[in-house]
């Protein structure tokens, strides 16, 4: 088999928008959102290392990453202005890993499985308001067959998202009042059937949410 190793670095830069610097907006007469002309640009440093292995019809890739974001632009409550104001927050560190495996067979059958883990490093004392789910996984099973004037394809896609523990603000006038909440894990499935009945004529039937998943709460 063939094995390869890659490393990369990328730097990011985002200047504050005119909206973030100068907008004054009435949020449904509940509170005001104010721009901040003193905002600093967001910068980021992104590191990744990946390994790939290929042998015949099989492929495996593993990637690790570490990202640092400085001066992230967000909103915070201003007691002086009695409203929210755009501001910069201290650096955020995000790390994680991804794994992808795939196989393709001569009979037309193929499969792909992927998994990702993400961790956001929150400084002690700061509320954990991220809704990023730490574990996600996807799976795809596909059968594809071609003839002279006809082609047939059926694919089953599934996506799993783990539960996430986070905090929600409980007050419109304070960024110190939060409550801990847990959003449950769930899985979604989609089935797609495609047929090429003639040159330039395709028919596709798709069923989203195959098993009729309904969340216990909306957020």
Where do the PLM segments sit?
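Repeated loop/turn-to-beta-strand initiation elements of outer-membrane beta-barrel proteins
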Residues: 2-5, 57-60, 107-111, 147-153, ...
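Short, glycine/charged-rich beta-strand-loop motifs at protein surfaces that mediate ligand recognition
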Residues: 3, 63, 174-183, 189-194, ...
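C-terminal beta-signal and adjacent terminal beta-strands/loops
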Residues: 14, 70, 160-170, 194-219
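Hydrophobic alpha-helical packing residues
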Residues: 5-7, 18, 141
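Outer-membrane beta-barrel translocator domains and adjoining extracellular loop/strand segments
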Residues: 19-24, 31-32, 72-80, 118-128, ...
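Gram-negative outer-membrane beta-barrel transporters
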Residues: 65-69, 86-167
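Outer-membrane beta-barrel signature, preferentially recognizing the C-terminal barrel domain
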Residues: 2, 11-69, 79-104, 131-135, ...
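Transmembrane beta-barrel domains of outer membrane proteins
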Residues: 10, 50-54, 100-104, 114, ...
């Amino acid at each position: 088999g063939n094995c390869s190793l890659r490393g990369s670095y990328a730097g990011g830069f985002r200047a504050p928008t005119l909206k973030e610097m100068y907008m004054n907006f009435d949020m449904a007469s509940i509170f005001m959102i104010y721009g901040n002309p003193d905002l600093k640009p967001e910068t980021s440093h992104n590191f990744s290392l990946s390994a790939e292995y290929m042998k015949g019809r099989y492929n495996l890739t593993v990637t690790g990453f570490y990202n640092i974001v400085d001066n992230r632009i967000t909103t915070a409550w201003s007691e002086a202005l009695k409203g929210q104001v755009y501001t910069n927050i201290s650096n955020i560190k995000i790390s994680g890993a991804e794994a992808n495996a795939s196989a393709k067979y001569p009979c037309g059958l193929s499969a792909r499985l992927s998994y990702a883990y993400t961790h956001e490093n929150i400084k002690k004392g700061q509320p954990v308001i991220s809704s990023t789910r730490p574990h996600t996984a996807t799976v795809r099973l596909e059968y594809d067959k071609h003839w002279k004037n006809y082609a047939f394809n059926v694919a089953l896609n599934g996506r799993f998202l783990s539960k996430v523990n986070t905090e929600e603000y409980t007050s419109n006038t304070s960024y110190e009042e939060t409550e801990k909440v847990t959003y449950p894990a769930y899985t979604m499935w989609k089935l797609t059937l495609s047929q090429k009945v003639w040159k330039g004529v395709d028919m596709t039937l798709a069923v989203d949410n195959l098993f009729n998943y309904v969340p216990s709460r909306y957020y």
